[in-house]
Curated annotation (Swiss-Prot):
GO cellular component: cytosolic large ribosomal subunit
Gene source species: Cupriavidus necator (strain ATCC 17699 / DSM 428 / KCTC 22496 / NCIMB 10442 / H16 / Stanier 337) (Ralstonia eutropha)
Pfam families for this protein: Ribosomal_L27
Keywords linked to the UniProt accession: Ribonucleoprotein, Ribosomal protein
Biological process per Gene Ontology, one example term: translation
Database matches in SUPFAM superfamilies: Ribosomal L27 protein-like
InterPro entries referenced in this protein's UniProt entry, alphabetically: Ribosomal_bL27, Ribosomal_bL27_CS
Annotated Gene3D superfamilies: 2.40.50.100
Name of the protein in question: Large ribosomal subunit protein bL27
Gene from which this protein is expressed: rpmA
Length: 86
């Protein structure tokens, strides 16, 4: 005879790793070319001047400069640009 009851099963015990999304460089801060500005799912924020878009919708700087956020158009879309360092 077993001296212990069988250990039951559980439906818990798994969790996905966080993806570290969000703004990495804020408005007014300096950034180098190639630096990541925002990691996002979909285009929550759109690319403006001197900003590139990666295949996972990551926004990155194409030139050295300062980050600038703006709200554009009638749909009030957020847009991020990089103002080149003079």
């Amino acid at each position: 005879m077993a001296q212990k009851k069988g250990g039951g099963s559980t439906r818990n015990g798994r969790d996905s790793e966080s993806k570290r999304l969000g703004v990495k460089v804020f408005g007014g801060q300096a950034i180098n070319a190639g630096g990541i500005i925002i990691r996002q799912r979909g285009t929550r924020v759109h690319a403006g001047d001197n900003v590139g878009v990666g295949k996972d919708h990551t926004l990155f700087a194409l030139v050295d400069g300062h980050v600038q956020f703006a709200v554009k158009g009638p749909a009030k879309k957020q847009q991020v640009s990089v103002v080149p360092a003079a």
